[in-house]
Amino acid sequence: MKRLQRLWPLGLLLGFVAGLPLWFIQRNSTFLSGAYRYPELDKPLIHSSIESTFVSWVDPKAPQYITSFLDRARQRRSLALITLEPFPDPSRPQSDRTLVRDVIRGDYSQRIKAVLDPLCRPEQPVLLRFAHEMDNTGQYPWSVARGDDYVRLYRAVWAQARHPQCQRIHWVWSPAGNATSDLFWPGGDAVDLIGISVYSSPRWSHNGQLSSFAQVYERRRWLHRQFRKPLLVAEMGVSGTDQERRRWLLDAREAIRRYPELIGWVYFSAPQPSWIPLATGHEDWSLSPQLLGLVTSPHPSFAFHCQVLHVSLPVLHRKICRIRQA
């Protein structure tokens, strides 16, 4: 948090974790919210304060896409959340097995530089969610069995971005939230926020009932207690009938009031990717515009104010923002 604090005017009681321009600070909503939509749509979501996307660093068009995405987020007065996926170079033999080694020895340095260049522009802050859900072993090439291998990968990329021009990149370490997530912790100096995934499907319970947002979130909350970083639900999805999903979202809106460490959420409004099959069958997490409105419509949250106070006036934060240990 130290490098974030330098970006704050002393005593400023409005803003996100750091460095957001005044046009963002003055938004009505006090809880960050947004959605990833596939296919991406030109029309912005009403009240959305986060623009979310996924980028593979081996995509030759990645730098240009990042530039245009950041421009779009700025025009919409939203915070950019970019999930950077370190897929192996398909032209390299067995690169899926040697990804960590190849990154460590510098084979991907030019690719990393190419995607960091637009991210390091001084015009706006960006949340960089790098190599997400690494604790789902085997799901991605970076979902390695050994936590220390992942840590070496993460810190190698983070180190390449340690540069004065990149101070507005805020790093989001984003496990799925499994019991072994702590094995992949890259160190507090390399993490500004912890991202988690919250999904619920009636197929995942023995009685066909949806697990509530609170039930799933509570199983992830230990990450905040252990590492003392604010939480962001970086991916969220619910399946079922529209009526079931509406009820789930309404309950979620009420539940977030109980979590002062939670600063926002992002809904994954898209079908489950076909190349990441689920044991319970295909899921479509897409929401109608009406239901997405429940995700992004303003809902004040105590968490936002506590995070502001933590950064700008820590003495006052200690008096009124006692985050529960339970």
Region roles according to the model:
Residues M1-G15:
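N-terminal Sec-pathway targeting helices
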Residues F69-I169:
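Substrate-binding cleft of extracellular glycoside hydrolase catalytic domains
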Residues G34-L41, A62-L70, Q110-V115, P175-P186, ...:
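Alpha-helical scaffolding within the catalytic cores
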Residues I25-Y108, V238-T241, V266-Y267:
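N-terminal substrate-binding region of glycoside hydrolase catalytic domains
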Residues S49-S56, S181-L210, F268-A270:
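Aromatic- and acid-rich polysaccharide-binding/catalytic face
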Residues A234-R324:
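Substrate-binding cleft of secreted/luminal carbohydrate-active enzymes
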Residues Y154, R162-T180, P230-S239, Y267:
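Aromatic-lined carbohydrate-recognition surfaces of secreted/lumenal glycan-active proteins
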Residues S68-E85, F184, D189, Y199-G240:
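Glycoside hydrolase catalytic-domain groove-lining segments
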